[in-house]
Design a protein with these regions (language model features):
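C-terminal charged capping/lid subdomain of soluble metabolic enzymes
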Residues: 18, 23-103
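Glycine- and Gly-Pro-enriched alpha-helical subdomains that act as flexible
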Residues: 9-13
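Conserved phosphate/anionic-ligand binding catalytic regions in large, soluble enzymes, centered on
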Residues: 1-3
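Conserved protein kinase catalytic domain
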Residues: 5-8, 25
Length: 103
């Protein structure tokens, strides 16, 4: 949850799967969705409605400096899941997502 907004924003900004994001935004209630970015907006609204939008890594003892370690750990332990992403996420991409997500 804490990295989901930046995770999906990464793919939205790459424009690697705009149509699926538009369809998901519509499924989430954005009737007039026309841009992939509408999915990220709907995701943030859903997080707010569920009371999880304010989750912070810092509240769980995660330090900003740990982004590199978290990225390496994600790739080492969950590497197979990375093949399901719409485009390749390398170590630097993962680290950046963690850093942008940090609060």
């Amino acid at each position: 949850i804490m990295i989901s907004t930046e995770y999906y924003r990464y793919f939205v900004e790459k424009h690697v799967c705009d149509e699926p994001f538009i369809r998901m935004a519509k499924a989430m209630g954005v009737q007039d969705a026309q841009r992939a970015e509408d999915f990220v907006t709907a995701l943030v609204q859903l997080q707010e409605a569920c009371g999880v939008a304010e989750l912070k890594m810092s509240d769980y003892g995660i330090a900003r400096e740990g982004a590199d370690t978290l990225a390496a750990n994600a790739r080492e332990t969950m590497g197979g899941l990375f093949t399901a992403d719409p485009c390749e996420l390398n170590h630097e991409d993962c680290r950046m997502i963690y850093e942008k997500s940090y609060r």
